[in-house]
Design a protein with these regions (language model features):
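Interfacial and helix-entry/exit segments of alpha-helical transmembrane bundles
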Residues: 2-38, 48, 54-67, 91-115
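Short amphipathic alpha-helical coupling elements at transmembrane boundaries
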Residues: 3, 9-16, 46, 83-84, ...
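Phosphate/oxyanion-binding loops and surfaces in catalytic or ligand/nucleic-acid-binding neighborhoods
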Residues: 30-33, 71, 81, 85, ...
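Membrane-interface interhelical loops and short amphipathic "cap" helices
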Residues: 41-57, 127-137
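Alpha-helical transmembrane segments of polytopic integral membrane proteins
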Residues: 44-45, 71-75, 79, 210, ...
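Predominantly late transmembrane helices and immediately cytosolic-facing juxtamembrane segments
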Residues: 54-95, 163-188
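Membrane-interface and transmembrane segments of multi-pass membrane proteins
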Residues: 102-216
Length: 216
């Protein structure tokens, strides 16, 4: 209900009172940050590899850094909304997840978020799907046809990639800072105020949108 509390800092513990929302958000979140095996992982790593194997290293490293950022803001919502103390004192009831108009789309969209990458991998890679893009897709196709071969090998190969390391860094930082309230992560923010200011200002996106889009 949009007219109720929207500040995630005032939420917590909602995984028990909104279990379906919790499960579908978890699936969608894992896909968004590109956890190996999820649909978002296939699309993310394919895009990253396009730049890597075409020697566009500046964009490649920018994308790797963006994985950490994406992981941080996604898991921040996850920990603050669904874990910790139930600050809203919300009890499990049919009133919270009673509307099929909302629940059915959540469930329907969560399913392909988990599995569609496996189904489309061969089509995207081995049928030269990227050959007409702005980069040389044939280089990528050659690499996958000769070294990766199939989606299972691509999945296993991902655990040795730099993007997976970036994912782990983002997960660990988020877990200790947002969930465990670790003193080390808090000290890092205190000693490096620039990082704290960037996070508090939400990367400047709100200021940018407010300056470009009229309030009325």
């Amino acid at each position: 209900k949009c007219h109720h509390e929207q500040n995630i800092n005032k939420m917590g513990g909602l995984r028990f009172s909104m279990p379906i929302t919790f499960v579908t958000f978890t699936v969608a979140g894992l896909s968004l940050i590109g956890v190996p095996g999820m649909s978002g992982f296939f699309s993310k790593d394919l895009i990253i590899d396009i730049f890597k194997y075409n020697n566009n290293y500046i964009i490649y490293y920018m994308l790797v850094v963006s994985i950490v950022v994406t992981t941080l803001y996604t898991t921040k919502i996850f920990f603050k909304v669904f874990f910790g103390t139930n600050k809203l004192k919300v009890q499990k009831s049919n009133d919270l997840e009673h509307n099929k108009t909302l629940l059915i789309p959540l469930i329907v969209l969560a399913i392909p978020s988990a599995i569609i990458g496996w189904a489309l991998f061969d089509t995207l890679v081995f049928n030269h799907f990227f050959s007409d893009s702005i980069t040389d897709g044939n280089t990528l196709s050659y690499f996958y046809q000769n070294y990766i071969i199939n989606s299972v090998n691509f999945f296993l190969h991902s655990f040795t990639s730099l993007s997976f390391l970036a994912l782990l860094i983002g997960l660990l930082l988020s877990y200790f800072h947002y969930h465990k309230k670790n003193k080390i992560s808090n000290n890092i923010l205190v000693k490096i105020p620039m990082i704290k200011n960037i996070l508090l200002n939400e990367y400047g996106f709100n200021q940018l949108s407010n300056s470009l889009i009229p309030n009325n």
